[in-house]
Design a protein with these regions (language model features):
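Conserved beta-strand positions in the central sheet of alpha/beta enzyme cores
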Residues: 40-41, 69, 92, 170, ...
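Short, electropositive alpha-helical surface patch
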Residues: 219-236
């Protein structure tokens, strides 16, 4: 079974928590898994990650229980084929607008006769040719998650969900906010209404649906709407928030570092211990 499908099945009514991976650091990815995140999205759309970096991040996630999903740069056959050959088992395919584009996305993830994925005998995806009957079994273990990011796409939700081979839908609140005229304001009532409506409709047709929120409070809201799995921020976002909080807590309004007493002496940012 596909790892994401298995995770969602075992989670029941509890929405698994994930995060976004944007840093090209296997150590950070592995740390996120050990921190307790149950799934992650390795993002090739909005980062400069190359294929070898993606492989290293997949290997790092593989050292944990965290299920990796790779977001490809675009809904095109070549990108999808290369990422699958690199060993990804679940793909997030961005900006799917209708059933035709959904069919094209799914076809790119499947070998003939179910799809058009090109066959390579020696790839990381097939464990370098050691997986028995990989060309036949891969179609059952690959997962396709399609991202809806505009009101036009959400209007086609049921038609997209009905395409055979679609494992899950994923709402992109950032691009959705821009498409609704509220760029960057994902908490705007117009955006939240569309998000809630999309979650309700996915639940009605039995289609798992995920999304991403920037704060714990937003994640709780999305879970209450009916989203089956939700990510919070990203590795870089979590790093920046922690770093900024530390700097704010230890810096005076005039920009000087607070003075601390250490072993009977004082220490400032300009001195040495």
């Amino acid at each position: 079974m596909n790892p994401l499908r298995q995770l969602l099945k075992s989670a029941g009514s509890h929405a698994p928590l994930g995060t976004w991976i944007m840093a090209a650091s296997p150590l950070v990815t592995e740390a996120m898994g050990h921190a307790g995140f149950q799934w992650c999205v390795i993002d090739m759309e909005h980062t400069p990650l190359d294929m070898m970096e993606v492989i290293h991040l997949l290997q790092a996630a593989g050292n944990t229980k965290m299920v990796p999903i790779v977001r490809v740069p675009w809904n095109d056959t070549v990108s999808i084929k290369r990422v699958l050959d690199a060993g990804a088992q679940t793909l997030l395919i961005p900006f799917v607008q209708n059933a035709d584009e959904a069919q094209r996305a799914v076809a790119a993830t499947r070998y003939p006769p179910e799809g058009i994925r090109g066959l390579a005998g020696m790839s990381r995806g097939s464990k370098f040719g050691t997986v028995p009957d990989y060309a036949r079994t891969a179609n059952k273990t690959v997962g396709a998650v399609l991202q809806l990011e505009t009101p036009a796409a959400v209007a086609q939700l049921e038609a997209i969900a009905a395409v055979p081979g679609v494992d899950s839908l994923f709402l992109g609140p950032g691009d959705l906010s821009a498409a609704l005229g509220h760029a960057g304001n994902t908490g705007h009532p117009d955006v939240m209404r569309v998000m809630a409506d999309a979650a309700r409709r996915c639940n009605a047709v039995g289609m798992p649906v995920g999304t991403v929120g920037g704060t714990p409070e937003v994640v709780v809201q999305y879970r209450a709407m009916g989203f089956n799995y939700v990510a919070i921020g990203s590795d870089l976002g979590l790093l920046m928030r922690g770093a900024q909080a530390a700097v704010k807590a230890l810096t005076t309004p005039d920009g000087e570092t607070h003075v601390h007493t250490l072993s009977g002496g004082t220490q400032t940012s300009s001195g040495a211990y």
